[in-house]
Amino acid sequence: MLTAIRKNGLILAVFACVSTGLVALTYALTAEQIQQQEQKQLLQVLNQVIPHKYHDNPLAQACTLVNDDKLGTAKTMHAYLAQRDGQPTAIAIETIAPDGYNGEIKLIVGIANNGTVLGVRVLAHQETPGLGDKIDLRISNWVLGFNGQQVTADNQDDWKVRKDGGQFDQFTGATITPRAVVLAVKKAVEYVNQHQQQLHNQPNPCEGQ
């Protein structure tokens, strides 16, 4: 009987080892696929907010880490540094609108060296379907209204929704969400305008993060 118990114990031990190995292998393969998919999605977004004509460098690798309250959060954000023929041309920077209707709205803003907004995309949000979710390009083209805009000393009041006297449309039944996004984009542009040279001169420590 003792021999049978030992035999069963050995079988269970082998089974446990094999199962653990299979789980580890599956995780490793899945993690690699997830990482590749995330990298692909990142490149797609970066190329939307910084068009190809502005860069010939690998944007996803030309990345630096930024921490500033101007970006709406105490968390570390990513900034992607575009170059063309070895010369700085634009920056895509992550930012947070902390005061969305249902919480934080994460954005990425592409800004040319002359301060012109090249593109804005929403990376994450929890806004109400049919109302605040119109900030998402998959739902409406509202976010394209930032393209070509600049922030200057003379147009500060324009960077508001129309209900507040500005130039950006609000949504029917949802003013809080677009108001939050407009302010967040404005602050991101101001931050990049103020720190452009510093950002381009920073090392690129965030590859793979």
Curated annotation (Swiss-Prot):
Q: Record's superkingdom? A: Bacteria
Classification lineage: Bacteria, Pseudomonadati, Pseudomonadota, Gammaproteobacteria, Vibrionales
What's this protein's name? Ion-translocating oxidoreductase complex subunit G
* InterPro entries tied to this protein: FMN-bd, Ion_transpt_RnfG/RsxG
Which NCBIfam families does the protein's record reference?
Answer: PRK01908.1 (NF002519), rnfG (TIGR01947)
Which coenzymes or cofactors are required? FMN
Tell me where it resides.
Cell inner membrane
* GO annotation terms (biological process): electron transport chain
Report the SMART domains cross-referenced here: FMN_bind (SM00900)
Q: Which UniProt keywords apply?
A: Cell inner membrane, Cell membrane, Electron transport, Flavoprotein, FMN, Membrane, Phosphoprotein, Translocase, Transmembrane, Transmembrane helix, Transport
Give the membrane topology.
Single-pass membrane protein
Q: Origin organism of this chain?
A: Vibrio cholerae serotype O1 (strain ATCC 39315 / El Tor Inaba N16961)
- Chief place of localization: membrane
The modified positions for FMN phosphoryl threonine read 175
Q: How does it assemble?
A: The complex is composed of six subunits: RnfA, RnfB, RnfC, RnfD, RnfE and RnfG.
Q: Supply the EC number(s).
A: 7.-.-.-
Q: Which family does it belong to?
A: Belongs to the RnfG family.
Disulfide topology:
none
Its biological purpose: Part of a membrane-bound complex that couples electron transfer with translocation of ions across the membrane.
**Would I find Transport among this entry's keywords?**
yes
PANTHER family recorded: ION-TRANSLOCATING OXIDOREDUCTASE COMPLEX SUBUNIT G
A Gene Ontology MF term for this entry? oxidoreductase activity, acting on NAD(P)H
What top-level class of enzyme does the UniProt entry assign? translocase
GO CC term, one of those recorded: oxidoreductase complex
Pfam families in UniProt = FMN_bind
Ranges annotated as spanning the membrane = 9-29
